[in-house]
C-alpha cells in the first residue's frame, strides 16, 4: 500500500479491543467469544445510562453534556438535543433491585432498547441482552425474566463495572442507603448541583419510605390471616422490608443533614476530592478517596 492509502485509514477506528483473541488473551480460547459478547452488552447498557443522564444522545454525536452544576442543560433540551430519547430531567436515576419507581434505570434501559430497535423486536432484544450478560457478567438464574436479569445486573454488577471502566474515578456516582440496598441511585457528576440532594429526598426517598411502610402494614394484616408455610413466607417478606425501612429512615436523616448544607462541587478538584464531601451517603468512599467516609 502507498502512503495515501495509509493516510485514509482513520486510526481511531482500529482497535485491538474488538479482537477477542487479543483482548482476552489470558483466558481460555473457548471462553473468549462469550466474554466479548457479555462485555459488549454491558457497554451498551453503560451507553444507554449515558443517554439517560444526557451525557450522550441518540440525536447528536460524541459527548453532548459535560459541563458543571447542570448549567446549560435546559437549553440543550429546549433545542431538541434529546428529542429521540429524552434525558432524565434531574440526573438522578433510581437503581433498585425491585420495581419501586416507574423511571428507574431498568425501565429506562427497556425504553432505550424499544426506541433504538423498535417495539416489534423488543422482547427478543431484551432476551438477547439478558442471555449475553449471563455469559460472563452475572450468573444465570433459573426462571428469571429477561428484564429481571437486566435489573439484577444493574443492581449488583453495573457499579463494579463502572468503577473498573473509569479506574475508580466514576462519572456516575452511587448514592446508597447501605447493605440492605433500601435505596440506591446514580447521579451524573456533571449534572449534580447544590439542590440535587434535596430533590433526591423529596422525589425519591420520602415517597419510598411511605411505600415501604404501606407494604409492611399490608403484610402485617396478611400474616394475621395466614398459617403454616404461607405465614412463614409473609413474615420473612415483612422482616426483610422492615430492615430496608429502618435503613432508609437512617439514610433519610443523614441525607436531610447534607441536603441542608447545599454542597457544591468543583470539577477542577477531581473526583477523588469531590466524592469525599458526602460522608457515607455514597458507596465505596474509601476505594475512591483513599480514606474512610468523613462524617460532618
Where are these regions (language model features)?
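Terminal accessory regions of large proteins
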Residues: 3-296
Amino acid at each position: 500500500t502507498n502512503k495515501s492509502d495509509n493516510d485514509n485509514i482513520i486510526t481511531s477506528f482500529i482497535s485491538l479491543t474488538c479482537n477477542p483473541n487479543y483482548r482476552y488473551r489470558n483466558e481460555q480460547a473457548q471462553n473468549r467469544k462469550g466474554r466479548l459478547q457479555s462485555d459488549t452488552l454491558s457497554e451498551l447498557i453503560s451507553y444507554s445510562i449515558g443517554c439517560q443522564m444526557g451525557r450522550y444522545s441518540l440525536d447528536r454525536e460524541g459527548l453532548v453534556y459535560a459541563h458543571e452544576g447542570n448549567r446549560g442543560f435546559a437549553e440543550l433540551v429546549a433545542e431538541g438535543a434529546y428529542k429521540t430519547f429524552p434525558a432524565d430531567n434531574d440526573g438522578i436515576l433510581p437503581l433498585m433491585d425491585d420495581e419501586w419507581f416507574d423511571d428507574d434505570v431498568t425501565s429506562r434501559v427497556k425504553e432505550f432498547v424499544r426506541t433504538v430497535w423498535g417495539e416489534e423486536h423488543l422482547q427478543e432484544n431484551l432476551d438477547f441482552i439478558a442471555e449475553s450478560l449471563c455469559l460472563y457478567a452475572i450468573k444465570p438464574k433459573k426462571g428469571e425474566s429477561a428484564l429481571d436479569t437486566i435489573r439484577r445486573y444493574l443492581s449488583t454488577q453495573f457499579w463494579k463495572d463502572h468503577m473498573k471502566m473509569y479506574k475508580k474515578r466514576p462519572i456516575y456516582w452511587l448514592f446508597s442507603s447501605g447493605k440492605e440496598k433500601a435505596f440506591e441511585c446514580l447521579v451524573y457528576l456533571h449534572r449534580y448541583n447544590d439542590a440535587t440532594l434535596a430533590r433526591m429526598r423529596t422525589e425519591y426517598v420520602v415517597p419510598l419510605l411511605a411505600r415501604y411502610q404501606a407494604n409492611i402494614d399490608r403484610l402485617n394484616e396478611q400474616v394475621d390471616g395466614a398459617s403454616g408455610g404461607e405465614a412463614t413466607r409473609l413474615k420473612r417478606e415483612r422482616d426483610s422490608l422492615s430492615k430496608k425501612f429502618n435503613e432508609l429512615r437512617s439514610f433519610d436523616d443523614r441525607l436531610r443533614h447534607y441536603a441542608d448544607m447545599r454542597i457544591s462541587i468543583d470539577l477542577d478538584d477531581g473526583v477523588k476530592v469531590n466524592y469525599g464531601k458526602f460522608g457515607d451517603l455514597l458507596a465505596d468512599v474509601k476505594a475512591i478517596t483513599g480514606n474512610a467516609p468523613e462524617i460532618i
